[in-house]
Amino acid sequence: MTKSELIENLASTNPNVPLKDIENAVKDILEQLSQALENGERIEIRGFGSFSLHFRQSRIGRNPKTGEKVDLSAKYVPHFKAGKELKERVNIYS
């Protein structure tokens, strides 16, 4: 699902809320999440999951086209860990 599809789904399930308000709410939520991660904070949404940063050490990688070795610098990457309730909903058919 894309951000546009999310906004459309929310608009169809909430016909009394103006589309512009829904767009702004989604954008504001995503901006708040991004800012929190940018500041090194952990975000926890109970029942859904948590977002945090994981540190990746520098390493030597390879260019997939040429096979040439490439130095990859150390960096932080966003990480999502699904919560118990989300895991259960996703695995309802297993």
UniProtKB/Swiss-Prot annotation:
Look up keyword Protein biosynthesis and say if it applies.
Answer: no
Alphabetized GO MF terms:
DNA binding; structural constituent of chromatin
Database matches in Gene3D superfamilies: IHF-like DNA-binding proteins (4.10.520.10)
Q: Mind listing the GO biological process terms from this record?
A: DNA recombination; regulation of DNA-templated transcription; regulation of translation
Q: Which SMART domains match?
A: BHL
Q: Which GO terms describe its cellular component?
A: chromosome; cytosol
Q: Does the record bear Oxidoreductase in its keywords?
A: no
Keyword set, alphabetical order: DNA recombination, DNA-binding, Transcription, Transcription regulation, Translation regulation
Q: Which InterPro entries match?
A: Hist_DNA-bd, Histone-like_DNA-bd_CS, IHF-like_DNA-bd_dom_sf, IHF_beta
CDD domains, alphabetized: IHF_B (cd13836)
Membrane-spanning ranges: none
Q: Which family does it belong to?
A: Belongs to the bacterial histone-like protein family.
Q: Which HAMAP family match?
A: IHF_beta
Quaternary organization? Heterodimer of an alpha and a beta chain.
Tell me, in a sentence or two, what this protein's role is.
This protein is one of the two subunits of integration host factor, a specific DNA-binding protein that functions in genetic recombination as well as in transcriptional and translational control.
- Family annotation (NCBIfam families): hip, PRK00199.1
By what name is this protein known? Answer: Integration host factor subunit beta
Organism expressing this protein natively: Histophilus somni (strain 2336)
Record lineage: Bacteria, Pseudomonadati, Pseudomonadota, Gammaproteobacteria, Pasteurellales
Give the gene name: ihfB
